[in-house]
Structure formats: structure tokens, C-alpha cells
């Protein structure tokens, strides 16, 4: 029963929050610091459909741009004990197909893209709380603990493995690394949990941006919080909010003030 509940929980998380890992913008992801048994493997898959208005640099003369994006995502997590703490390492990979449309110099245009997105890896360790336990010990601990606080830290690395062509403005990959150190705290009280996570994004340069340009971005600093209510193991609901600052881009040494 424990394994079944954990698998259901894992799949729910992937379906709800697997996709945002692949975005450059801030994601809102609840339960990223949840206590898991060590020595376990988790796998899940999900699908997301996205519609959005997008904006481009005015110099490109692209207006009223929209995108429709289909994403199929798979995720794997392995948990283990690390320096007497509970830890995990995970991998996310997605395949995407989408259509972008808008006005280029006042003329309607559209383009389609399909392929793999950037791979994302995450290593996380709980510094306080959430002891490294297996099987029955883990189940017994979770059954008796009603109030607890967990503090964790993590590093997310987005790899430049996605579909990318330097002669195209729209790509599924980013052609650069992104490093995201994280620090989070969770307070559980009965069926309620309150989470707070601070994170910053460090971008390497894209020296092969569209039309031979060089793209740079300042670090992006983010803060997010979530309130989670657990109805039963494997079924929960969450509400969250986030704030981000920074990430301004520079093209060929010229600040874009975005």
C-alpha cells in the first residue's frame, strides 16, 4: 500500500509540475521537498498543452505572436542516503511539438517545431528533518509524525541538449546551460503544509543565437510559497504564488532593458 500511494503521488506531481522545469521563466512547483523513502525509484509521465501570447524585441517587427505547444514529459527519481541525510537525484526529458503564428512586417506568418527539449537534472538533499529511512521504518515514521519542519537544498542543471538551429529564431532548446541553486523550508502540521523556496538562475551565454548574435542574461532571483492540503496519501491540492526579479538580457553587449 505504501508503494502504491507513493507511485500515485509521484505521477500526480509529474502531471501537474513536470513541464515547468523546462522553462526559462520561474516555475511554481509544490512538494519539491517532500520526504521520500531512501533506496527507491520513481518514474512518471505526463502531457501538457500550452497556449500563450508571446512578445519579441521590437527590432524584429513581429506582432500579435501566439504559440500552441504540446509537451510529453517523462521523469525519473532515485532516492538514497547521502552523508546520513535523505537525498535524491532526478532527470526530466520532454518531447515537444508546437505552432507559432503572428504578424511579420504586417504579414501573417506561422512556423512549426518538433523535437526534444533540454534535459534537466536535479540533485536535492534534506539538511534538517526528513531522516533517511526505508520501507517499514519510513511508513512508521510518517504515520506517527504530525508536526515537522524540513529544510532542504538543491541544484538544478538545464543541459543544452534540446532541438536547436542557430539560423532559427524559435527553438525548443536554449543552446546554453542554466544552473539553479535552491534553498527551501517546509512546515507540516497535520494535513496542512506551508512551503517557501528561494532560487536563483545563472545562465551561460548563447554564442550562437539567432542570426549570429550573442545572447546573455543577468541572474534571475525568485521566491515562491505554497500551501498544500493532503486529503489522503496520493491526493492533495495546492495553491501557490511566486515573485521573480532580474534576468535582463543583453544582445551583443547591448542591454535590452527587458
Protein language model features and the residues they cover:
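Bacterial N-terminal signal peptides
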Residues: 10-20
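Outer-membrane beta-barrel biogenesis signature
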Residues: 23-44, 130-147
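Outer-membrane beta-barrel channels and translocator barrels
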Residues: 38, 50, 81-84, 96, ...
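Membrane-embedded beta-strand positions in outer-membrane beta-barrel channels/transporters
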Residues: 42, 69-75, 120-122, 180-182, ...
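Transmembrane beta-barrel strands of outer-membrane/channel proteins
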Residues: 43-49, 89-97, 151-159, 196-202, ...
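Outer-membrane pore/translocation modules
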Residues: 97-216, 258
Amino acid at each position: 500500500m505504501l508503494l502504491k500511494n507513493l507511485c500515485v503521488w509521484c505521477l500526480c506531481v509529474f502531471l501537474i509540475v513536470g513541464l515547468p522545469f523546462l522553462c526559462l521563466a520561474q516555475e511554481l512547483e509544490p512538494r519539491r521537498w517532500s520526504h521520500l523513502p531512501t533506496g527507491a525509484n520513481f518514474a512518471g509521465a505526463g502531457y501538457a498543452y500550452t497556449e500563450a501570447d508571446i512578445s519579441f524585441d521590437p527590432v524584429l517587427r513581429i506582432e500579435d505572436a501566439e504559440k500552441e505547444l504540446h509537451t510529453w514529459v517523462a521523469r525519473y527519481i532515485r532516492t538514497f542516503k547521502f552523508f546520513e541525510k535523505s537525498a535524491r537525484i532526478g532527470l526530466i526529458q520532454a518531447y515537444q511539438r508546437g505552432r507559432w503564428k503572428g504578424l511579420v512586417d504586417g504579414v501573417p506568418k506561422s512556423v512549426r517545431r518538433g523535437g526534444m527539449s533540454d534535459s534537466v537534472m536535479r540533485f536535492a538533499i534534506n539538511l534538517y528533518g526528513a531522516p533517511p529511512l526505508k520501507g517499514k521504518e519510513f511508513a512508521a515514521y510518517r504515520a506517527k509524525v504530525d508536526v515537522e519542519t524540513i529544510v532542504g537544498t538543491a541544484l538544478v542543471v538545464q543541459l543544452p541538449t534540446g532541438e536547436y538551429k542557430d539560423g532559427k529564431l524559435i527553438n525548443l532548446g536554449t543552446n546554453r546551460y542554466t544552473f539553479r541553486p535552491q534553498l527551501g523550508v517546509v512546515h507540516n502540521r497535520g494535513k496542512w503544509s506551508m512551503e517557501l523556496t528561494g532560487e536563483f538562475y545563472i545562465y551561460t551565454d548563447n554564442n550562437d543565437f539567432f542570426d549570429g548574435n550573442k545572447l546573455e542574461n543577468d541572474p534571475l532571483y525568485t521566491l515562491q510559497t505554497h500551501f498544500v492540503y493532503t486529503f489522503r496519501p496520493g491526493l492533495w491540492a495546492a495553491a501557490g504564488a511566486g515573485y521573480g526579479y532580474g534576468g535582463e538580457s543583453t544582445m551583443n553587449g547591448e542591454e535590452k532593458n527587458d
